[in-house]
Design a protein with these regions (language model features):
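A generic beta-sheet turn/junction motif
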Residues: 20, 31-33, 82, 163-165
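Bacterial Sec-dependent N-terminal signal peptides
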Residues: 1-21, 165
C-alpha cells in the first residue's frame, strides 16, 4: 500500500510539473477602482489564440453605478513573438444585468427597474508577460447590446494584472 501511494504521488508530481502553463487569472484594476471588480480566467489554446471569460460585479451602492453584473466570454488572437502575448484583437459577448431606471416615491425607498441584456463586441489591446509569468494588459473596445434596452452599448476596457500558471 505504501508503494502504491508513493508511486501515485511521484506520478502526479511529474505530470503536474510537465504540464505547460496555459492558464491565466487576472484582475481588472481599473474596474476595481470604479467599484465593479472584474476577475478573468483565460485558457491558452495555441501560441497565438486564447479563450476566456471575465466576471464583473458591482460592490458600490445602487445609486452610484448602473452595472450590477456582467459576464463576458471572449476569444483573442495574438500577434506577438511570445506565446499568447503582444498585440491582440478580441471578439466578445456580454451578458449584463443593469439598472434601467429608478423610481422615487415620497413614502418609500427608491425602486430599481433591473434589466438583463446580451451583446456582441470587439476590443484590441496588448498583453505583457514577464519571465516570472506575471501579466499586465491594457485594452479597449465597445459592444452593442441587442433588444429593447436603454443602454444600447457596453464598454470593454481595462488595465489588468495577473499570473500565468
Amino acid at each position: 500500500m505504501k508503494n502504491l501511494i508513493t508511486i501515485l504521488a511521484l506520478t502526479s508530481s511529474v505530470l503536474a510539473y510537465s504540464q505547460s502553463e496555459n492558464n491565466e487569472l487576472k484582475v481588472n484594476i481599473l474596474y476595481t477602482a470604479l467599484g465593479a471588480p472584474e476577475l478573468s480566467y483565460e485558457r491558452i489554446l495555441s501560441d497565438n489564440s486564447a479563450i476566456g471569460a471575465s466576471l464583473a460585479f458591482s460592490i458600490d451602492s445602487k445609486d452610484n453605478m448602473d452595472l450590477r453584473f456582467g459576464l463576458t466570454p471572449y476569444y483573442r488572437m495574438f500577434f506577438g513573438q511570445k506565446k499568447a502575448a503582444g498585440f491582440f484583437i478580441e471578439a466578445n459577448t456580454m451578458f449584463i444585468n443593469y439598472i434601467d431606471s429608478i423610481s422615487y416615491s415620497s413614502n418609500s425607498s427608491p425602486t430599481y427597474n433591473m434589466k438583463t441584456g446580451f451583446g456582441l463586441g470587439a476590443a484590441a489591446g496588448a498583453k505583457f508577460l514577464t519571465k516570472n509569468n506575471l501579466i499586465g494588459e491594457i485594452y479597449g473596445g465597445l459592444g452593442r447590446v441587442f433588444g429593447d434596452n436603454s443602454i444600447g452599448a457596453y464598454p470593454r476596457f481595462g488595465i489588468t494584472l495577473g499570473k500565468r500558471f
